[in-house]
Amino acid sequence: MIIQPIVEGQGDEAAVPLLLRRLRDEAQAWGLEVGRPHRKRRTQLVKKDSLQSAVRVAALRENCAAILVLFDADDDCPKELAPTLEEWALEAAGGKPCAVVMANREYEAWFLASIEALRGRASILPDATSHHEPEVPRDAKGQLERRMPRGASYSATVDQPILTAHLDLESAYRGCRSFRKLVSAFGELAVAAGVAPAVWPPSAWVS
């Protein structure tokens, strides 16, 4: 059984499968594999026709059991926009379970909630600290660069997969509502695909 991601950026192509496999392992949903992401521009993911086209392509991939659309909210409100996008996606999914998750405001906000675990990775300074409101800054990538040596820059294609591999999932869950939405959606998709997680989310994350 494969969960098929649809993403927006080059960094997401490498990072999102890593993240989903980490969630899969935490959930002990061993029968669930992660497909190669189908990438579309953000402008295409917020329009009905192009979103539905992407979902149809994903649904046709071999052994696709569920579809996850994941991209940055930017200045949009996930609570307002995501339900409409998910409705459109479900119309095109051919009966397959499908979820839309918008990282608020950017995927990198999840790193800002877990900086202590990322020290020494991708140039993150050894004394860097997490942001107290990681989903508030508009420029999460810039916030990451403030936690790097002067002159260092963040590269999504290089750094996003590295930081994803070392992200403290519990810290991201506790600090970011949109990450909690991702965790919830992942569990629901796994169940719908016939691969029920053990205890989800892990009890340690919610205690």
PLM features per residue range, with description:
Residues 2-3, 12-41, 45-207:
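C-terminal accessory helical subdomains adjacent to catalytic cores in phosphodiester-
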Residues 5-7:
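Short hydrophobic beta-strand that contains or immediately precedes a catalytic carboxylate
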